[in-house]
Amino acid sequence: ELTVSGKTLRENLEWWEESERRKYVRNFLSQNDKVDPGNVIMNKANATLRGLTSTVTFPKGNIAPEGSVIKSTAIDPEVIDKDGVYRNTGLARVFNSEKDAMRSIKSTGPDKLKKGEILVIICGGPIGTGMEETYQITAALKHLSYGKHIALLTDARFSGVSTGACIGHIGPEALA
């Protein structure tokens, strides 16, 4: 697949490795900021050796054949297995809006969102509500005693302060 440059991502990255701009930035970090450029962006092997996990993950699969985004470091380490993977098998509760999903979180009745369930919000993508931001949901889940045990799947987006197992930007979006 081509990028906006007309080249593949691989071609762009290979060019960047040898570019004068990259050499300048690495030198600037080293000389002016006293930062080792090799410690700023690392390959997976070096990051793992230092005990770091992926910041973001871009999985594809049967639910997201065109891809999705997970802010991996926002997932509570207590729900990550020994392989470093978050897994959740549970009942999927599907909502057409953030407002409807919030009702299930706030409910005190039988429709209340339960531990282990998977919260799915559809119609929040570009064609739907225009990529609305789902912070209300992630903030509400953070304040549930069992919120870290609930996964959120959506075609909408997340803010930088969102926490938990949030799989967003799912493509294709529900209304595609």
Cite the ranges covered by each PLM segment:
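Catalytic or ion-coupling anion/metal-binding cores of large enzyme and transporter domains
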Residues: 1-165, 169-176
